[in-house]
Amino acid sequence: MPKSKTHSGTAKRFKVSGSGKILRQKAGRRHLLEHKATKVTRRLDGVAVVSKADTPRIKRLLDI
């Protein structure tokens, strides 16, 4: 059976931490920020851990 390829779109959006958790950026902070409160944009800063339910699918796409 041939090797499965890494899904390039997934590889750009997610990364694996040292402990094996899958990390992602929070959505909603790219544009149209004028009407959003500073508090909201700060909350959307940083990384988040992918939920347990989505982890197997992401791992399969990343070929882990």
UniProtKB/Swiss-Prot annotation:
Which GO terms are recorded in the biological process aspect for this UniProt protein? translation
The cysteines joined by S-S bonds are none
Entry GO CC? cytosolic large ribosomal subunit
**Residue ranges, compositional bias (Basic residues):** 1-15
Q: Which InterPro entries match?
A: Ribosomal_bL35, Ribosomal_bL35-like, Ribosomal_bL35_sf
Keywords attached to this Swiss-Prot or TrEMBL record, sorted alphabetically, are: Ribonucleoprotein, Ribosomal protein
**Source species, domain of life:** Bacteria
Disordered: annotated span? 1-23
Could you state a single Gene Ontology molecular function term?
A: structural constituent of ribosome
Q: Does the keyword Ribosomal protein apply?
A: yes
The family assignment reads: Belongs to the bacterial ribosomal protein bL35 family.
- What's this protein's name? Large ribosomal subunit protein bL35
This protein's encoding gene: rpmI
